Amino acid sequence: MSMITITESAQQHFGKLLAQQPEGTNIRVFVVNPGTQNAECGVSYCPPEAVEASDTKIELELFDAYLDELSLPFLDDAEIDFVTDKMGSQLTLKAPNAKVRKVSDDATLMERVDYAIQTQVNPQLAGHGGNVSLAEITEDGVAILQFGGGCNGCSMVDVTLKEGIEKELLAQFAGELTGVRDVTEHARGEHSYY
């Protein structure tokens, strides 16, 4: 698990802010609504009395950063940076796993494929108001997907599925997945019109 990265410039920025706070004050990094589409990463001051026994402490040169137990898995690979450009300076927080908990390498194929869909496929479909979810993985390794939102009934679903999603998932899960199908295509039987 690669922990959160707080860049040198961000550490200097927090160091200056903390110098104006009561002694012993550090920072807390957290995620509000973790594991949901509304997840947001935040930073706040953390006075000594606010430190919990279950917190994870990251010791830095100028201060310590505390992460609460609930936020911890969602802050994996997160980065806090302090960027200065022509427009001024700003703190940037990137937490790629805030909306979806990162799965471990030994997770089931279903969990790993679902994670890939939530973090790689759905952000691309969101621009069209669409989404896709994993319905099942068949015994012969075919991932059955359920399209929703703007994708449902869209004539481009087949192209999106074959050219985009299937290529991406088969490359990522080579040797584990044999194909990717739309749930309606998979469910087609003698009762289907075409």
UniProtKB/Swiss-Prot annotation:
Listed GO biological process terms: iron-sulfur cluster assembly; protein maturation
This protein's record includes keyword Metal-binding: yes
Pfam assignment, any one: NifU
Binding site for [4Fe-4S] cluster: C151, C154
Transmembrane segments: none
UniProt keyword terms in alphabetical order: 4Fe-4S, Iron, Iron-sulfur, Metal-binding
Domain of life of the native organism: Bacteria
Obligatory cofactor(s): [4Fe-4S] cluster
Molecular functions per Gene Ontology: 4 iron, 4 sulfur cluster binding; iron ion binding
Kinase listed as a keyword: no
Gene3D superfamilies assigned to the protein according to its UniProt record, in alphabetical order: Fe-S cluster assembly (FSCA), HesB-like domain
Free-text comment on the cofactor: Binds 1 [4Fe-4S] cluster per subunit. The cluster is presumably bound at the interface of two monomers.
Subunit and partners: Homodimer.
Listed HAMAP family: Fe_S_biogen_NfuA (MF_01637)
Family that this chain belongs to: Belongs to the NfuA family.
Role played: Involved in iron-sulfur cluster biogenesis. Binds a 4Fe-4S cluster, can transfer this cluster to apoproteins, and thereby intervenes in the maturation of Fe/S proteins. Could also act as a scaffold/chaperone for damaged Fe/S proteins.
Name used for this protein in its record: Fe/S biogenesis protein NfuA
Gene source species: Photobacterium profundum (strain SS9)
